[in-house]
Amino acid sequence: MSSTDNFFIYYLAAIGNPNIDYKIKILKHNLCYIFNNIKKPYDIIINCYDDDCALPIETMLNSLSFIRNIFIHKKKGILVELWNTNPHHDILKNYENIFFILDDVKIINMNIINLIFIKKTFNISFLSPKVIGGTWDYMRKYNNNVIGFANNIEIFCLLFDYNDFMKFMHINDINNPWTWGVDLLLGYYNIKSAVYYNFSVKHMLPSNSNHGIAGGQMATYLNERGFKSVNDVNEKYKPIYKIIQCPYPFSSLLPFKRKRLLYKNKMILLNK
């Protein structure tokens, strides 16, 4: 893979029934949205937990000329069970930017180039857009050009580099495959995380998790790390601990133009 091929990869956390036709529509919307934004072909990794869904997914992907390489991991299981067995994770080290997203999350308003710029400028490990339809109010609290630095980010849509992606894999636990509670402990793990509220995604479907099982697994996950409850975590690690106005007018950031941007005497190079 040449250096010109590795700017961006779309990572679909998991996909399958129910509602597969609708989820494929969301996926197609997101892929087209991103291509219209970055104007460059890119690759995709998919975790598919339902064999019956693989063919219609591949058919849709093959209809999109801008999707270059398709890597599909087919296995029955829940999120962490799929990730821990995905044979394609090694290729992720070749990519500058990994766009991690759930199958029922739709992009509403986003500029990938600007999101990357924010991540690099502020040295953020886990960066999320505003999430409409999530659980917590602080994920959608603001509607303007602000960044919320966070100890807790709901895991719907995150921008990573490879090292950040591996951090995310590492903090997950096979005994907590639904991932509940992992988002609460980003401050505990000392992972610099933030929400950029000017861009948004929307959670389009109700959770398919088994709430009783997932909740019990979360309680164990938190207890093993010294926390009695969600409230206990939030008392020690405030979900949003700092809000700043994003200091850049993004109208000048043109996609895929070589551009050096100076922030506090630090040179940031985008679109190498």
Can you name each region flagged by the protein language model?
Residues M1-T59:
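N-proximal low-complexity "stem/linker" segments adjacent to membrane-targeting elements
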Residues F7-N30, N176-K272:
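C-terminal catalytic/acceptor-binding lobe
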Residues I46-E96:
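Active-site-proximal specificity loops/subdomain of glycosyltransferases
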Residues C48-C53, V105, K130-T135, F199-S200:
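Short beta-alpha junction loops
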Residues K93-K106:
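Short beta-strand-to-loop acidic/aromatic patch adjacent to the donor-nucleotide binding site
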Residues F100, F126-K130, S193-N198:
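A structural signal for short, well-ordered beta-strand segments and their strand-loop junctions
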Residues I107-Y188:
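Conserved catalytic core of nucleotide-sugar-dependent glycosyltransferases
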